[in-house]
Amino acid sequence: HIANKSKIYSGAEQYLCFEHDAKTGKPFLDDQGRMIARKGILKDAINCDFDSFAAECMETNNLYHKNKGTADIKSHDYILSFDPKDDITAMETMELAKKYAGKFLEGHQVIIVIHPDGHNGSGNIHAHIVANSVRKYPALKQKWHEKVREYKQGCKHKCTNAMLRSGKQWVMDECRNRGLNQVDLFRSKVREDYWVQKRGLEKDPDFMTDKDKLRIYVDAALPFATSMEHLAEILH
């Protein structure tokens, strides 16, 4: 999960749909100076139109007088990543992502983008679920909700420990029911340097460890980071 304070909602959309340099976060351009679309992605939206996500989020923010300050969290990015051995399709990944969003981000404007691969051809298909922090429609009260504002219309999404625990358990249960490989999301893991992991993948395509999760987090954080220091702050 990544909480984003940038008011430029279109930045996430552009990063998810167009090729970017993984180190700098800058878009790759063709000979005519145009951004290059990512290949093989699948995209969808909930409670909004994908192409007008940014404008619709700002409209909701203005309606409920939210997200006016620079320190306000504007959006949330949740990532579901799968083992290459699962051979899960983009459509199946989208189905799981939409179920997750419907359960844990109910009432929010959400865009979902499925990336068929990670860096260096690692093959780990993954879903980016980006939600406006302000809830456009009311949600049903769930067992992990601790306060009314966690499901009330016009209030902001709270990524609480209770919500994260329920979300992790849901993902593990879904993977288990579908016969997919999974990791214990409740087990502490040592995360080493991101680029060490990338070099390992370059030397050996089968190099897969727990650090793969960190690689996905960095991939999601890059469009929101303005500097390496800011990137470190987001990941922290």
Which sequence ranges carry the predicted segments?
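N-terminal nicking endonuclease/strand-transfer module with a His-rich metal-binding environment
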Residues: 1-236
